Amino acid sequence: MKNFNLILVIGATASGKTRLGVELARQLEGEIISADSRQVYKGLDIGSGKDLAEYGEVPHHLIDIVEPGHEYNAFQFQQDFFEAFTYIESRNKQPILVGGTGLYVDAVVSGYEFVQLDKDLALRAELDLQPLEQVQKLLLELDAAQYEKTDLTVRPRLYRAIEIAKNKQTNPKPAKALPEIRPLYFGIQWDRKVLRKRIKTRLKERFEQGMVEEVQGLLDNGVSHEQLEYYGLEYRFVSQYIAGQIGYEEMFDRLNTAICQYAKRQETWFRRIEKHGGKIHWLQGSGDIYQQACEVLADLG
């Protein structure tokens, strides 16, 4: 048995993830699962960077599966992912996850247990008064397995994990077992200045392709400005431009800056993967990333 059953292609926005995922799928008889929180929506094409033509003959999953206006979340993604993953594996094909949205990837690899549970405001107020180390210790005592899955540096996530652990004690029931994921991470790395240039170039291309018209079409079809805020940076800023809140140049500059800031936050997420024991095989974007990935696969046997 090979030591991985899921290839993950990660990297900052505009790093070339889809292209690498497609090339690997062709080489390995694979199928792509998108881990992008916006590409699930029909009609969110240019702003979400679907690039469907790039897939060619390669089968892809979790793209264009819900209508705009539906609030799709990480719990639904986890369910849909494992359905696609099981289907791909059952046909002896290689699943390749291309992402994307950090929470979605975490939901798959970490096997988050999603629970429909209200916040315990009294408990949270009590935990607010305790040192972080004491809160971490409480979670460890309640549920060691949940402790291992949780980002221990973020209080809201710790609080949620404690709420889930306490709920398990009072309402024990067997969780639905999720398939085991053995990940192989490929990360695409660019010099920061080069990445910023790629982001700006891609943004210009998206406006030339009709991103403003795409957002106007969504509004015309009943998607509200408030819902567009939920669909991420491109839709948020273009919506503000259409509403007359900002001019075109200001919209472009602010959007470009916001995307670059988002790329920096993605780097923080990559470091967290490594901090928690994930091995990322970094590929240099300035070189032939496909060839670099093939060399890693050859070394792994």
Curated annotation (Swiss-Prot):
Q: Which SUPFAM superfamilies match?
A: P-loop containing nucleoside triphosphate hydrolases (SSF52540)
The molecular function terms of the Gene Ontology recorded here are: ATP binding; tRNA dimethylallyltransferase activity
Q: Where is this site: Interaction with substrate tRNA?
A: T101
User: What does the record give as cofactor?
Assistant: Mg(2+)
Residues annotated to bind substrate: T13, A14, S15, G16, K17, T18
Task: Report the superkingdom from the record.
Answer: Bacteria
| Enzyme Commission no | 2.5.1.75
**Sites where the protein binds ATP:** G11, A12, T13, A14, S15, G16, K17, T18
Entry keyword set: ATP-binding, Magnesium, Nucleotide-binding, Transferase, tRNA processing
Q: Which reaction does it catalyse?
A: adenosine(37) in tRNA + dimethylallyl diphosphate = N(6)-dimethylallyladenosine(37) in tRNA + diphosphate
Region of interest (Interaction with substrate tRNA), residue spans: 36-39
Q: Which GO terms describe its biological process?
A: tRNA modification
Relate the assembly described in the record.
Answer: Monomer.
Concerning its family, UniProt says: Belongs to the IPP transferase family.
* Protein function: Catalyzes the transfer of a dimethylallyl group onto the adenine at position 37 in tRNAs that read codons beginning with uridine, leading to the formation of N6-(dimethylallyl)adenosine (i(6)A).
HAMAP family the UniProt entry points to: IPP_trans
Q: State the NCBIfam families in the record.
A: miaA (TIGR00174)
Its name, as the record gives it, is: tRNA dimethylallyltransferase 2
**Provenance organism:** Shewanella sediminis (strain HAW-EB3)
